[in-house]
């Protein structure tokens, strides 16, 4: 057994001990069985959260949501770095404008996410 599969088996055993249910579907990447947690999430013991889609339209929606989440994460990281740099010079007008732009972009992104989920 390879090291990765040993780790996967140990994590799978831990998921079962925690009350997860083993599903008949397998991870498309590593072929390990998928597990359904008590909260309803489906996870691979090796790769973490997995999204099961039943149609091309559903796949597009999931991919779009993942991309929006990634963009949101990038914006939050940029906002955090700008705020951290602003501590050095609180009167830096360029930095203030940059923070406002990050906040505006985050607000727009969240509106897009809300509208797409309706």
UniProtKB/Swiss-Prot annotation:
Cysteine-cysteine disulfides: none
Top-level taxonomic group: Archaea
One Pfam family it belongs to: Auto_anti-p27
NCBIfam families to which the protein is assigned, alphabetical: PRK00420.1-1, PRK00420.1-4
Family classification: Belongs to the UPF0148 family.
Protein name from the UniProt record: UPF0148 protein SSO0781
Organism: Saccharolobus solfataricus (strain ATCC 35092 / DSM 1617 / JCM 11322 / P2) (Sulfolobus solfataricus)
